[in-house]
Curated annotation (Swiss-Prot):
Keyword Disulfide bond among record annotations: no
Full protein name: Ribosomal RNA large subunit methyltransferase H
Originating gene: rlmH
Annotated S-adenosyl-L-methionine binding sites: 76, 108, 127-132
Keyword presence, Methyltransferase: yes
Amino acid sequence: MRITVVCVGKIKEKFYTQAVDEYSKRLSRYCKLDIVELPDEKTPDNASDVVNEQIKNKEGERILSAIKDDAYVCALAIEGKMLDSVELSEKIDRLGIDGTSNITFVIGGSLGLADAVLKRADYKLSFSKMTFPHQLMRVILLEQIYRAYRIMKNEPYHK
């Protein structure tokens, strides 16, 4: 299985980078992991709704160009479906059983995801109704994917 994480924005803090590196290393036993970092647009303070929408659309174009045609796309969105860790594991497992070999998770920038990206998504996943920094969300997502594989393999980790 190939797992791709498409993210808007770069990680600047060393502790986030270390966590991403650790979970990437752990996941290498279970899947081929690719992390695609896309540049984010500068968001002016007090930007109008129109400007914010333009920024989301520019970022959205970059996201869509990074998604392979055969990918099953899972967009992280507040309005998505919340799953527990076992349900996420079952979802990934079922996709593999059904013949999906490429899952792409998408993490948007500070303004969220463009409508075009949400339309391209095969599934919308929410981790919470709260908003998280995209750097932290990347770590949380990778940890949950790692946990999902451990659950699938009946290996100790998940409690």
